[in-house]
């Protein structure tokens, strides 16, 4: 087993990382930052998502374990005081990983280039100081002509992130559905959109055709300035992000702990 540790640089995190490294070294665990089997992240959700993008080309062979040292962690199963238990579980348990759907983003430029991205949570298309004008297609059929600040397409687990703040539904990852939410759409006698989140089936796809030369696309919060894009296609990826199963909390327990209250009764959810 080859392991690497990704972390932020807060004092509490660095203390946890130092202890974790000593513990793994005592267990004769091999450290390999280039081709790891396990990526342990110490910090919060941002740390884990950054680590995913670092290893997204190896996503089919890498499992993630998140150690939480901040205030809120949706993807991080372990706390810094559980490190000993986590390492024992890592070395003793085998089994199928918990898998969550990823978002595949395919952007075609006017020059004919194709660019691909993967997202754990979401991708948004928007303009900063002007209205975004775009045509939205579902399965290559025109659905609406959008006018507004932007559009957000999310995965099921991403439905608890930016999409939720836009009024989107929270979706269980077993559904493997895409959700699109509007960002401040313009609706009047001239411009009309659905003005509600939409959820589409796993075998469907959403295409956004911008009617502007310049806009911003975000992928898990990372900003990309885009010029002369012909269209952006979103679909559920054939790849998944994989988490080590031991200690992995059920989805609705995560939602409850993140947004409603703390609970120790995690087994009541499936």
Curated annotation (Swiss-Prot):
Keywords: ATP-binding, Cytoplasm, Kinase, NAD, NADP, Nucleotide-binding, Transferase. It comes from the Bacteria. Its cofactor is a divalent metal cation. NAD(+) binds at residues 45-46, 121-122, 147, 149, 160-165, 184. Pfam families: NAD_kinase (PF01513), NAD_kinase_C (PF20143). The active site is at 45 (proton acceptor). GO terms for molecular function: ATP binding; metal ion binding; NAD binding; NAD+ kinase activity. GO terms for biological process: NAD metabolic process; NADP biosynthetic process. InterPro entries: ATP-NAD_kinase_N, ATP-NAD_kinase_PpnK-typ_C, NAD/diacylglycerol_kinase_sf, NADK. It is found in: Cytoplasm. Its EC number is 2.7.1.23. GO terms for cellular component: cytoplasm. It catalyses: NAD(+) + ATP = ADP + NADP(+) + H(+). NCBIfam families: PRK04885.1. Belongs to the NAD kinase family. HAMAP family: NAD_kinase. Involved in the regulation of the intracellular balance of NAD and NADP, and is a key enzyme in the biosynthesis of NADP. Catalyzes specifically the phosphorylation on 2'-hydroxyl of the adenosine moiety of NAD to yield NADP. This is NAD kinase. It comes from Lactobacillus helveticus (strain DPC 4571).
């Amino acid at each position: 087993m080859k392991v690497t540790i990704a972390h932020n640089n807060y004092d509490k995190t660095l203390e946890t990382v130092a202890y974790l490294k000593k513990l793994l070294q005592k267990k004769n665990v091999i450290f390999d930052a280039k081709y790891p089997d396990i990526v342990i992240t110490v910090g919060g959700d941002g740390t884990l998502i950054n680590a995913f993008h670092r290893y997204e080309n190896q996503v089919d062979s890498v499992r993630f374990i998140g150690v939480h040292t901040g205030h809120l962690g949706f993807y991080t199963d372990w706390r810094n005081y559980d490190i000993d238990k986590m390492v024992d579980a890592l070395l003793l348990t085998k089994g199928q990983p918990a898998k969550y759907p990823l978002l595949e983003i395919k952007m075609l430029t006017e020059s004919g280039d194709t660019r691909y991205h993967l997202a754990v949570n979401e991708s948004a298309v928007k303009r900063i100081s002007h209205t975004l004008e775009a045509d939205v297609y579902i399965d290559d059929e025109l659905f609406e002509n959008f006018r507004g600040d932007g559009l957000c397409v999310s995965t099921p687990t991403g439905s608890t992130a930016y999409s939720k703040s836009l009024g989107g539904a929270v979706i269980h990852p077993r559904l493997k559905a895409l959700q699109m939410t509007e960002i401040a759409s313009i609706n009047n006698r001239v411009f009309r959109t659905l003005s509600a989140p939409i959820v589409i089936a796993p075998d469907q796809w959403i295409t956004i055709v911008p009617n502007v030369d310049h806009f911003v696309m975000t992928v898990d919060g990372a900003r990309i300035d885009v010029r002369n894009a012909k269209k952006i296609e979103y679909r559920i990826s054939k790849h998944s992000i994989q988490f080590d199963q031991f200690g992995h909390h059920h989805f609705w327990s995560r939602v409850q702990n993140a947004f409603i209250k703390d609970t120790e009764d995690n087994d009541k959810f499936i």
